[in-house]
Amino acid sequence: MARVTVEDCIDKVDNRFDLVLLAAHRARMISSGSPITVDRDNDKNPVVSLREIADQTIAPEDLKEELVHSLQKFVEVDEPEPDTIPLIGSAGASVDADDTEVAVERMTEEELLKGLEGLAPPEEQPEEEE
């Protein structure tokens, strides 16, 4: 029997690197007990997987999808979007459905100055000469 080469498979999978990834993944699947779709002919699993790709008994798109799923560490879950929060001070801000108003607390200038007096000034650090 003639040996399977990359040239036999390159018209099925355009990129040689993708072909190697897919064939290796299929060979691991065969090693873990997945049934083969071509005669083994005393060939090893990587050769059998290349022959399956060349004979189109296995779809490369399906292999690619299985490879991606096998490499995923986290399952993507579609979570609901959080409620949108209107921007503060935007002129066209939408009003909530329940029409509740937000109470804004006003400070006088004297209250503001008293609050600022309570703050400690930042410590001055000596300037370093270079």
UniProtKB/Swiss-Prot annotation:
Sorted alphabetically, the keyword list is: DNA-directed RNA polymerase, Nucleotidyltransferase, Transcription, Transferase
Checking InterPro entries in the record gives:
DNA-dir_RNA_pol_omega, Pol_omega/Rpo6/RPB6, RPB6/omega-like_sf
Q: Which GO terms describe its molecular function?
A: DNA binding; DNA-directed RNA polymerase activity
Q: Gene3D superfamilies recorded for this chain?
A: 3.90.940.10
GO cellular component annotations, sorted alphabetically?
DNA-directed RNA polymerase complex
Task: Name the family.
Answer: Belongs to the RNA polymerase subunit omega family.
Enzyme Commission numbers on file: 2.7.7.6
Name the SUPFAM superfamilies on file: RPB6/omega subunit-like (SSF63562)
Does the keyword Nucleotidyltransferase belong to this entry?
yes
Give the gene symbol. Answer: rpoZ
Please list the GO biological process terms of this entry: DNA-templated transcription
What's the source species' lineage? Bacteria, Pseudomonadati, Pseudomonadota, Alphaproteobacteria, Hyphomicrobiales
Cited Pfam families: RNA_pol_Rpb6
Q: Which reaction does it catalyse?
A: RNA(n) + a ribonucleoside 5'-triphosphate = RNA(n+1) + diphosphate
Identify the domain of life.
Bacteria
Task: State the protein's purpose.
Answer: Promotes RNA polymerase assembly. Latches the N- and C-terminal regions of the beta' subunit thereby facilitating its interaction with the beta and alpha subunits.
Q: How does it assemble?
A: The RNAP catalytic core consists of 2 alpha, 1 beta, 1 beta' and 1 omega subunit. When a sigma factor is associated with the core the holoenzyme is formed, which can initiate transcription.
Where does this protein come from, organism-wise?
Afipia carboxidovorans (strain ATCC 49405 / DSM 1227 / KCTC 32145 / OM5)
Show the segment(s) annotated as Disordered. 110-130
Q: What is this protein called?
A: DNA-directed RNA polymerase subunit omega
